[in-house]
A protein has these predicted regions:
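Short, conserved, GDST-rich strand-edge loop motifs in beta-rich repeat architectures
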Residues: 24-30, 83-102, 160-168, 216-227, ...
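Hydrophobic, small-residue-rich alpha-helical packing segments that form membrane-like cores
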Residues: 77, 84-93, 97-189
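Beta-propeller domains
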Residues: 14-52
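Single conserved hydrophobic/aromatic residue that forms the stacking wall/gate
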Residues: 1-4, 8-9, 13
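Entry beta-strands of beta-propeller and related beta-repeat scaffolds
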Residues: 17-20, 76-80, 153-157, 210-213, ...
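Beta-propeller blade signature
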Residues: 35-43, 97-115, 171-181, 226-240, ...
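Beta-rich accessory regions
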Residues: 234-431
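Surface loop/turn signatures of beta-propeller and other carbohydrate-active proteins
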Residues: 5-7, 28-30, 45-72, 116-149, ...
């Protein structure tokens, strides 16, 4: 059920199919010169992988096609991405820059008439050159353009960046506008010095009458996950001027340890869907993939907060009740815990500590994760309803009807299953 990928960022609907694009290094399961992989699905259960959509082919993107977004304009599919060029090549590894100062980032576009074939030679163009003004953004670290059509018919773009602040940097979102989806003009920006020194993968969207911005800050001062997190904040947003007037708090979208780089789009039913990437520090032994998508979530708004629900088509697929848990197949587990409850699912442990759901994966982790194995939810006010999904070395846990979600990557589960001190029935269902 989890689409395997290096890192996701781009989704859209075309011809009744969901098109999913993702960063992809086709030669190894580690970081390298980024291409765009491409898959389509009608239901997020069955996927068809298509040929690589984007690959480096121009001087301005010769060292990689980083993340971006996709949108249909006048019957054609527009792919926006960050083009990467190194000012100085690294003689020991052509897939990494010689130093951070040698990175050059610009924003580029490819247009396809059928959404399947992308001419990387004739149909590429650089639409926003490398930033020259340091007070606007960073010439090295400005990336992940998200484009949407505004109510007035114009196109807006938000890009993640950073600017110098005191003795460090602070994260920043840059806003651009276009009449035709090709020629963009810088309009506005928003920065916040208290949450990370670089913002990746920004997205602005509306649920009901409330605008939200989501982003993935780097190098936050909040352990245990300074670089594997995504935040959202309700914003008072003027879409005409692309101005964030004020904002609320910025809670986590996912309270697990591996969630990063989410992106939203509208479903066929006009619901706001979210996909995100689960970061992995190393591949599962014997596998050729590293990293995966979460299962898609439907986002809803309640009193200025985001509530997340599993995409109904997937949730309804778990309709066969089983008596025993097997980690060889996906399963759903639903129950209500109390303050003395505990679950041990193959070495992945769940209990309640100080009114919080506590997750520990120390027994099913890797050495590289040794400082990131223990995490807790926010306080739950004595209510501990959980809806847990397991598939492909990952647990996704929805708490109290999607008020919070926690996702965790695990390695090498054992066969042990121990469920203790639950007053309520435990329901386990498979596909």
């Amino acid at each position: 059920l989890h689409l395997l990928s290096r890192r996701q960022r781009q989704m859209c609907i075309r011809d009744r199919n969901y098109h999913i694009f993702y960063q992809h290094f086709p030669y190894d399961n580690k970081w390298g010169t980024m291409h765009w992989g491409h898959a389509i699905t009608k239901d997020f259960v069955n996927f068809e992988h298509l040929p690589i959509a984007l690959y480096p082919s121009k001087d301005f993107d010769r060292n990689g096609c980083f993340s971006g977004s996709a949108i249909e304009i006048d019957g054609q599919l527009y792919l926006y991405y960050t083009a990467i060029k190194y000012a100085k090549e690294n003689p020991s590894n052509v897939h990494n820059q010689y130093s951070d100062d040698d990175l050059r980032a610009s924003q580029a576009l490819v247009v396809s008439s059928d959404g399947i074939h992308f001419d990387n030679v004739k149909n590429k163009k650089q639409i926003i050159p490398m930033i020259q003004e340091g007070f606007i953004g960073d010439y090295r670290h400005t990336r992940d353009p998200k484009v949407w059509k505004k109510q007035d018919g114009k196109y807006a773009m938000v890009i993640g960046s950073k600017v110098a602040y005191e003795n460090d940097y602070c994260g920043k979102a840059l806003f651009y506008e276009s009449e035709d989806g090709i020629h963009f003009e810088y309009k506005n920006s928003y920065q916040e010095p208290t949450i990370g020194n670089m913002w990746e993968c920004p997205d602005v969207f509306k649920i009901n009458d409330q605008f939200f911005m989501i982003f993935s800050p780097e190098n936050t001062d909040q352990p245990p996950k300074p670089n594997s997190n995504a935040r959202y904040m309700p914003i008072d947003f003027d879409e005409d001027t692309l101005t964030i007037k004020e904002h609320g708090d910025w809670p986590y979208l996912d309270h697990g340890l591996d969630f990063y780089a989410p992106q939203t789009f509208l479903s066929k039913d006009n619901e706001r869907l979210l996909l995100g990437w689960l970061r992995m520090r190393k591949p599962v032994q014997g596998e050729e993939w590293i990293g995966m998508f979460i299962m898609p979530r439907v986002l809803k708004e309640k009193e200025g907060k985001i509530i997340q629900e599993l995409y109904p088509k997937i949730k309804n697929s778990f309709n066969h009740e089983v008596q025993e848990i097997s980690f060889d197949q996906p399963f759903q587990l639903k129950t209500t815990l109390n303050k003395d409850s505990s679950l041990n699912l193959g070495g992945f442990k769940i209990d309640i500590q100080d009114d919080r759901l506590h997750l520990n994966r120390e027994e099913v982790s890797i050495q590289e994760n040794k400082v990131c194995n223990d995490v807790v939810s926010p306080k739950l006010q004595g209510h501990y309803d959980i809806e847990l999904y397991y598939d492909h070395h990952v647990f996704e846990i929805y708490i109290n009807g999607g008020e919070y979600v926690m996702s965790q990557v695990v390695y090498d589960l054992n066969d042990q299953v121990i469920i203790q001190n639950t007053e309520y029935k435990v329901y386990v269902r498979s596909l």
